[in-house]
């Protein structure tokens, strides 16, 4: 039975996935260190494949880096070599590719306790369970009714699972909002508890990740203004109470930054915990797909 299951998964990936070439180039940066983190590397990813871009989420599972794009694709890299990735088209319940912007605008992803990929979408706010081959493998996740009131382009920007499998979801909201809304799934998998985080200095949430082995989360927030450019903030977030903790870092010029939206935590073999961030280039020639790695101190 196990042999046939492995064979099926291999064959399905071969059918649905297509490898593309990706170029990786180191980006120079000045040393950056705080009490909590140290900047270790920044690389830029490019590809001639027109599907590559708009990477707005990030997850690391074993030795695989997984991301989703704004145009409805799943990208799967090897953590050892990001020079090639498999591209998978996300599909709807009928097995058709997601083509309309309202349907394909994915923002975040996480893994549930059964191994399914949970992918959040905005505009048509929803969270759908997917296989690694881009196929829906279950019913949509029941969400709090208040999610429907989130703006089209300010929906489920960040999601993550706690150690017991419950979801934490964060709404980006409107620019003028004074608070950030988040919801923690109940143990019954039906109810939700709403929490709020005070918005500080007009930063908006873009990503969320859980540190290995505990329910301590790291919240990624971004601020942009034409004159000052992009700034990032990383904060601890209690996954049980929803309260903001210490600020790990504030990054701005001269550090090379872009539209960072995805974040994932992972642990090296030596026990060191790393944070990896990825930026969404919006398929614009004025932006870049950057991957930044920081070490927790």
Whereabouts are the PLM-identified features?
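Sec-dependent N-terminal signal peptides
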Residues: 4-12
